[in-house]
């Protein structure tokens, strides 16, 4: 019995059944073929002279696909890489960076030869042939030509330090999700007149689970401005048969790329020979004309390492040995055609491997080869002129489109204006003492306040936990239901494949990177902190590469149901470890964690974090109801004090004795409601500090840090935390203090299930246990009493 897909909004098109006429004339085809020869030759040069580093195979097999996108499909302006209305190309396959850099440099040469007016006026907005001297080089490289030509240090996987690159990619599958996030940002900002996002990836990069999650999200949301280009060469690092093909099972997966995309309601265009420019461009033009309202994938059957001399998986991250016969054979076609003579060494040794100047010799040989390639391109002016004209046409098409933001488009600048000008907590967010609420609910209300002020600049998703984590509040007042590009564009709630923290973080990072939204994702802190970490880290890398000193495009990962008060769910969910994955694990200023204990601290902390414009904000909020304390009556610092990151929660009534540092809401409530009254009953008078954000504290001037939390306090402190012990090491400096610090794993085991108070008691973190621990610690801090000296009778 044959099986088939159920009804789909999308189409599956086999190019060989379309009878599409060849899109290129014989002369045009010759120009594309010449460009590809330059490209394949340059990939061989890059691998040889780095030396022996990079990914030649997939770079070569995707070259013709990318050439079609850049010189035929995209509407963009080479002279203005930052144009927001332009189509985007996004290398989800970050390991094809060699190909990206080679194509960018050759495109720059095409424009330089054919029409220099096409180029950016600022050389920093170009990727020149000379910049290839920086391929996989560190920024502090000092070789002569790198310095002379001010070459860019081109990372092994692409970052936005390179013009026209919007994301950092390379961690498999993350680039797919973040590229889809870019498309989401463009589609929501521009509406139907949206830029297209062309995504480049191979079938190996489709195998991570986060990819299926992201494809499901895009298909469900009818994200029709995505065109996904799959370089299906069947070769990964370890396999030459990744997917099932015909009757042969795949070694990794049992789907073809066409089936995977169509399963998720994507249009599919099947290209039998991805080495044929006529088929490549015909498929791309068909994609441009589809009107199904669904995203599109073009799957090209290719050969990894084609014409390089090494094919399949052997060419993935490896190539010919340095200046070997295989290397020269890979360049033989270009050398014969252009009359080039590449640098070579006499005898059996390589000059670059001898003596202290080897790196300089290698660089000189590389530059010599690049100059010969440049001359070959200059001698082939018809190719440069033909492709240069196509670059000019791409700019003209873009200008004719006159893309503008849709009516009522979100205004992200209003969010940052709001938190900059707000004087204290807005009236509608203020909480009276005695109010019963949750941290998560107040975070939802605070973010909704920002969303209303910005006409919906916050798009929110959750791992099937919208109401449970209170982030549904953020989207209230906009369109009901889930966002859909055509059917429900006013909604602010995203459907991201269901329980999909991994893809959610990736999509939200791309959404933020487009620059017009703040993406908010929510789940249990136990899950979203680890599963969102890779996407958040790549987002921070990309943000800092683009703007080394900030400000950065912000995404928010809500680590909800945090800590031991989620105890009924057991240790799989009530996880103390989540904070340690994020806190202080990013370069300063790129990420900010928030650990409020009192719902009144939510707005001050959120506003302080947003003012700093980090790439990531990660609030840790608990699940159960709490009673808002009367801080003034209790002698506690006001909630606004939390914005310093560390603050003196309770000032001693006298001289003070010992220091206690607290972090996490459950243990803070236990201290305030139970331990503190017992300490005061006994006349014990410690300094009590609370850690509300380690990163906000780090961003204070050094002298302010010393004032807020003097070093002598850390040297005498003990800690009480609902997170893991290492999160206290910064604040508790002595061995004695660390040994006395209370934390969930002090007993050496994962905790059991039960209501929050029971789990706290099991951990020794309830108020009574805190009181006993603090009392005992203060006693150990006190110097022993001086013994009176008694004179012996003989000396009397």
Regions found by a protein language model. Give the residues of each.
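Short alpha-helical segments and helix-capping/turn motifs at coil-helix boundaries
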Residues: 48-53, 67-77, 84-87, 163-165, ...
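Active-site nucleophile and cofactor-binding loops and adjacent substrate-binding regions
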Residues: 51-63, 89-95, 148, 157-178, ...
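Non-catalytic terminal/interface segments that mediate subunit docking, oligomerization
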Residues: 34, 377-551, 625, 635-669, ...
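Cofactor-/ligand-binding subdomain signature composed of acidic, glycine-rich
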Residues: 1-45
